[in-house]
Amino acid sequence: MKKHWFTFLFLSVTLPFFAQQPLELQTAIGLMKENNTQLKIQQHEIELSNNELSETLSGFLPSVAVSHTGFYTNDPLNAFGFKLQQQIVTQADFNPDLLNNPDAMQHFNTKLSVQQPLLNFDVFVARKALREKIKAVAYQKQYAEDMLAVEIKKAYTNLQFLYEAKNAVSKGILAYIEVLRNTQNMQTQGYAKPSDVLMVQVGLSEVQNKQIEIDNNIANLSDYLSWLMGEETTLIYVPTQSLTQNPLIDHNSLFSENRADIMAMKSGVEAQRKMLSMHKQTLLPRLNAFGEFNYQDRDIAGLGANAYMVGASLSWDLFNGNKTFNTIKKTKISLSKAQDEMQLYIEKNKLELQKSKRDLEANQAKINLATTAKNQANETLRIIENRYAQGLEKTADLLVSQATELEKQVKHLEAIKDYNLSIIQIEFLTNKN
């Protein structure tokens, strides 16, 4: 009866995870690229930058406006001027009394005006700067995608480890249940004490607690993967590939400056360089053309008299309180700062690559040691189990051996997991992912 109770307890621990969903690594990465909210935000940034570039077309395209304005006045100057514009002036209108005290009159003006930029050197350079900004934002999106792919690979690797560890712990629980059954039988026969039974039960509880912890971590990792993939689900994911030691693509991989994050910084620096040139171009004159066509009439819908005017404007801001020169100086400082920040970022990432390579070597050594320790612990447990069955070993010794064997199995799996995580990091830093 007790054996059945412990078996039921073991099953009840794993019962919540029956609703599981197999998950392939590439499927997870594909869903991330389609649905991840961060990537959607990055895409909006690209669209906004493209829109900024479109706005600069105003520096090349004409501005066209139409207006219709009505007046009613007895002001001497305007009254006579409106008559001139309507082309209705007569000899009698030059009478001083009429000039000084005109009758009130109405006037309607329909105007078509056009303004055409001709030479605005700063706008040319501003468009080049915005193109570099668009490239930088696109690289930032690519970097975000690469980073999210790395996060998925790391989470997937940890999930593989947890399931392998769970299998090891599950076997350990079954082994403890069997030891408990044998110890209870030996107690019935007078070969074991009640304290031995309690000792086994305590050991079983400890292993079951480990399984609960593993199941909780699996659920948390599944939630994290769902978020990365942009999936609103509470499914528990199961890796379709088991945990194995992954090969490194190139043991002599060098740091790559062609990574998306560094390319984004390079484009950002180039954009600032173009902005510096743009501010310098504002010191040059600007040439713009303009023209307008007018209809003048006393009736609201009249198109009586008409006239046109065209011209060009050359403007040059010779001095604006030293504002332009201060802006140029500020932009130079910002450019130097951006260049130094990029250099610092590259130096830190090179250090990170060296660290990751050393971690890889250390993890390989850990795998070798963990493999030996696991084999030794397994052989030790086999010997002690045989002696325990013959009554030649204490229950405490058997429990210690079982705990050690389980620990070494998990340590071996953990070493493989850490090795694979180091590979993921190296491949990212060397742009091999």
Named regions from a protein language model:
Residues 1-36, 419, 427, 433:
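Bacterial Sec-dependent N-terminal signal peptides
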Residues 19-76, 191-193, 229-275, 346, ...:
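Bacterial Sec-pathway N-terminal export signals of envelope proteins
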Residues 40, 63-77, 101-105, 115-143, ...:
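Small/polar (Gly/Ser/Thr/Ala-rich) solvent-exposed segments
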Residues 41-56, 144, 148-167, 185, ...:
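Amphipathic alpha-helical coiled-coil segments
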Residues 51, 141, 145-256, 356-359, ...:
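Periplasmic alpha-helical coiled-coil/stalk elements that build and connect Gram-negative outer-membrane
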Residues 65, 74-77, 411-433:
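Acidic, low-complexity, intrinsically disordered peripheral segments
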Residues 77-101:
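Flexible, solvent-exposed loop segments that connect beta-strands
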Residues 107-111, 154, 199, 286, ...:
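Transmembrane beta-barrel architecture of outer-membrane proteins
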